[in-house]
């Protein structure tokens, strides 16, 4: 009886992405949610990332922009993260509570309206541009409303005379609860949403 040889070639994929959410997995690992230019919204597991000796240590924080390499899962939508090369930490997004809240809302909103693992480079570019803008300018109501309006345009759900938030709710259901918190934090203004 002759044995068979199994291919040891691993399939690896690469993309530029922004960390939109991070959750703990067990004692040492993390689940990292990404918005990627080439892969869309996706999740990876970073094994042993919470260990101080991990090659991921200090690299997997909210809003980090990086080149990532992962091994696709055949069984689920949770892929195995292999490498991360950070190109931007965006520490300015943590300079104030309002900037952090609005940036997090942008990520949550995108996750609630975009299809998983379906690349739409324009959505990545919108999020990236919004985070970069917030890194340089204080968070305000106008920025939040502009992001929502651009998102409705890119998704094809915006209509003349219809509030962007209302258009998003009509097309995708309830908006993230953090929107209300952001608007309260940013105060009343002429562009009340």
Residue ranges and their predicted role:
Residues 2-193:
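Non-catalytic alpha-helical scaffolds and adjoining flexible linkers that form interface surfaces
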């Amino acid at each position: 009886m002759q044995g068979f040889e199994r291919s040891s070639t691993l399939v690896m994929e690469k993309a530029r992405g922004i960390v939109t959410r991070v959750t703990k997995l067990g004692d040492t690992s993390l689940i990292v949610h990404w918005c990627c230019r080439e892969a869309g919204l996706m999740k990876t597991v970073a094994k042993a990332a919470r260990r101080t000796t991990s090659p991921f240590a200090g690299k997997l924080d909210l809003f980090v922009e990086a080149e990532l390499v992962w091994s696709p899962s055949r069984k689920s939508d949770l892929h195995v993260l292999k490498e991360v090369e950070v190109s931007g930490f965006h520490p300015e997004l943590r300079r104030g509570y309002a900037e952090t809240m609005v940036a997090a809302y942008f990520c949550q909103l995108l996750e609630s309206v975009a299809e998983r693992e379906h690349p739409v480079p324009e959505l990545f570019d919108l999020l990236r541009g919004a985070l970069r803008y917030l890194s340089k300018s204080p968070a305000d109501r106008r920025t939040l409303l502009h992001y929502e309006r651009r998102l409705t345009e890119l998704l094809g759900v915006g209509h003349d005379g219809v509030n962007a938030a209302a258009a998003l709710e009509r097309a995708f259901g309830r908006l993230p609860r953090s929107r209300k918190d952001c608007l309260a934090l940013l105060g009343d203004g002429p562009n009340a949403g």
